[in-house]
Amino acid sequence: MTNVTDQQLELIKKSIQFVPNYPKKGILFRDITELLKNPQAYSASITLLAYYYRNHKLTKVVGIEARGFLFSAPLALILKLGFIPARKSGRLPRDTIREPYILEYDNGFLEIHTDSITPGDQVLIIDDLLATGGTIAAAVKLIRRLGGEVNHAGFIIDLENLGGKSLLKEIGINSYSLVTFSNH
């Protein structure tokens, strides 16, 4: 890596704050709002993801509600790809398909519009954070059910000790994260 890239990654890492016992006791939450507030850190996060995925043969970017939208939509614009929101149940206005997910502190359903992915689409999934991999696994199932091909997922943060990267590897997804934290 270049010094510029190392400096950008350090800026990103330093802009992520730790909030204990949020949203429930025992969870050490990674807060990205400081990253978003800092235009250099926010821009660096999008730029580095765009650089990494620039030569992948992609047609769409699926962003995971809600914080994933903050990175996936600008990334889709830079890469000149379509953007597809994957939302929690009941928040999309037209026909959808849905898939259950189970997280460290939440569960529910993830949905996408039935006409958002077409057979043969090469799809990249983007979210702010990889923890257990439950939400991404649900998104992968949705994309594949609609005939899309998905082999990649990108993140700002990987919480490596929660096993998300291993889960994604088991279902054929290569994951890439800008920063990694090993403590929970």
Curated annotation (Swiss-Prot):
Cross-referenced Gene3D superfamilies: 3.40.50.2020
Keyword field contains Hydrolase: no
UniProt GO molecular function: adenine binding; adenine phosphoribosyltransferase activity; AMP binding
First-tier enzyme category under EC: transferase
Involved pathway(s): Purine metabolism; AMP biosynthesis via salvage pathway; AMP from adenine: step 1/1
CDD domains: PRTases_typeI
UniProt keyword terms in alphabetical order: Cytoplasm, Glycosyltransferase, Purine salvage, Transferase
An example Gene Ontology CC term for this record: cytoplasm
Subcellular location: Cytoplasm
Pfam families cross-referenced by the UniProt entry: Pribosyltran
Matches recorded under NCBIfam families: apt, PRK02304.1-1, PRK02304.1-3, PRK02304.1-5
Role played: Catalyzes a salvage reaction resulting in the formation of AMP, that is energically less costly than de novo synthesis.
Descriptive protein name: Adenine phosphoribosyltransferase
Gene: apt
